[in-house]
A protein has these predicted regions:
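Active-site beta->alpha loop and helix N-cap motifs at the rims of alpha/beta catalytic domains
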Residues: 2-134
Length: 134
């Protein structure tokens, strides 16, 4: 029988912005609010977190900030999907190196992949990442 990799309720966080970029004080408040109320995991840089509109560097900076703030209290699941398999692999590896406990990987959204292509995409990311992939 398989073991559950995550249990309970995970919250997909928004990424707050100001006109100058990510609003890190507001992000910390959001995290504290969720942690104080007993969430079991946080999901960062997913669809709700504006990942598709953020640069690679912005995504990594947000993932690193969330991992630091959470400080091991709950699992951090990092959105590391990308339209390009190589980019998804690189972002996944970097997110794991930053301390992410799991990865949220979206289906490539621009090119229409075959079923075989999708399996190859997800397998390549999962094999490279060494953490659970959702």
């Amino acid at each position: 029988m398989k073991q559950a990799i995550f249990t309970g309720s995970g919250v997909a966080l928004v990424t707050p912005f100001t006109s100058g970029g990510v609003d890190y004080p507001a992000l910390e408040k959001l995290l504290d609010f969720q942690l104080d109320r007993g969430t079991d995991a946080v999901i960062v840089c997913g669809t709700t977190g504006e990942a598709a509109t953020m640069s690679y560097a912005e995504r990594m900076a947000v993932i690193e900030a969330v991992v630091r703030r959470v400080d091991g209290r709950v699992p951090v699941i990092a959105g590391s999907g990308a339209n390009c398999t190589e980019t998804a692999i690189a972002l996944s590896r970097d997110a794991v190196s930053a301390g992410a406990d799991g990865l949220l990987v979206v289906t490539p959204f621009y090119n229409k992949a075959t079923q075989r292509g999708l399996v190859r995409h997800y397998t390549a990311v999962a094999d490279a990442a060494e953490k659970p992939v959702i």
